[in-house]
Amino acid sequence: MSSSSFSIENVRSQFPALEKRQIFGDNAGGSQVLGTVAKRQLSPITEYLIETNVQLGASYKTSTQSTAIFDNAYKAAAKYINAGIDEIVIGASTTQVFRNLAAALKLQPGDELILTNVDHESNIDPWLHYAALNNATIKWWTPSDLNNPKLDPEQLRSLLTNKTRLVACTHCSNILGTINNIKAIADVVHEIPGALLAVDGVAYAPHRAIDVKELGADFYAFSWYKVYGPHISLLYGSKAAQAQLSSLGHFFNPDGSLMDKLELAAASYELTQAIIPLTAYFGENPKQTWDAIAEHEQKLQTRLIEYLVSKPQITVYGETSTDKAVRVPTVSFTVEGMSSQSVVEAVEAVSHAGIRWGHFFSKRLVGSILGLSDDGVVRVSLVHYNTVEEVDQIIVALEMVL
């Protein structure tokens, strides 16, 4: 994609699935895949399986080719987030890489872990599990404003002690769409010597560039299948933070990189190499490309949120500001007098919109903070290949069913 100008027509032409009449409004659950990653004739995934599907690391020609492709994919992934190649690991999902990370962290009895119930469960349950096994203590960082929950770094400071070992939080809620200030949070966490910050970037990564060095997080994870690629994930771990991890690998294997410590051969070779065309999509100047994406997405969320807040029977959760600096176009709401399930089913009955209802694995947020049942919220989650016209069609459908 050219970073000099944003053409929605050009963007949409690169996603074969968009040829359908379906309006994809459930992108926070998984985005559509670039044609360069999964084109119909000979995708790079298929090419890998046909031409170089052998074990890595051998000396014969096909293995050296396969190893080079795999290594180049790792290099592309590391460059994409401004990390060293020895600071990343590819996994099956963000849930899986966080569980591996929690298993590897050398927890001691009395260590304190600070979690937030704003998060997706993937960045909560692993820490609860291994804290219990190691007699560590859990503290909860709960937002003070339950109507518009945000993670306040100053509130976090009051929870920190010299026993704090790790803070886990989300960069952006997969329900609220609110962007949290990770750099400010990291600065507060690192006031405690040795304390670590683990960030779930899954709901943020489809919308903005990621620079892990600028953010200052010790660990950062996201899923490529929500960033226009195949169903794999990435975990970053700084070299300094890796010193606090044990290796999950076999005793005779090296443990000098995050991949050595945590991969457990879980990186699908054929899917991993698809990272190369995926990252190339953002062009030679990715920052400009992402800036253009943010501008377009602001138009989408402005149209949708302005409509929703104009309806007295609708409650929007999270930021009602349409400013791209504070939120992404993942928008959740409920309708007075209607279940979220019935709203979604009614919208789908009168339109081509694909949206969703529920708690989206952020059950603690939906139940404990928002005070909702498992029926949860209606979520419309948009990305840069959606159009203003599609948003208008969703609005028309909502008008018909409210």
From Swiss-Prot:
Keywords per UniProt: Pyridoxal phosphate, Transferase
GO molecular function, one term: transferase activity
Induction summary: Expression is positively regulated by the cluster-specific transcription factor FGM4 and is induced during infection of coleoptiles of wheat seedlings. The fusaoctaxin A gene cluster is silenced by H3K27 trimethylation by the histone methyltransferase KMT6.
Disruption phenotype: Produces fewer spikelets with blight symptoms on susceptible wheat cultivars.
EC number(s) from the headed UniProt entry: 2.-.-.-
Domain of life: Eukaryota
One of the Pfam families matching this protein, by short name: Aminotran_5
Membrane-spanning residues: none
Binding site for pyridoxal 5'-phosphate: 137-138, 218, 282-283
Family: Belongs to the class-V pyridoxal-phosphate-dependent aminotransferase family. Csd subfamily.
Role, per record: Aminotransferase-like protein; part of the Fg3_54/C64 gene cluster that mediates the biosynthesis of the octapeptide fusaoctaxin A, a virulence factor that is required for cell-to-cell invasiveness of plant host. The 2 nonribosomal peptide synthetases NRPS9 and NRPS5 form an assembly line which likely utilizes GABA as a starter unit (loaded on the unique module M1 of NRPS9) and sequentially incorporates seven extender units composed of the residues L-Ala, L-allo-Ile, L-Ser, L-Val, L-Ser, L-Leu and L-Leu, respectively.
Protein name as it appears in the record: Aminotransferase-like protein FGM3
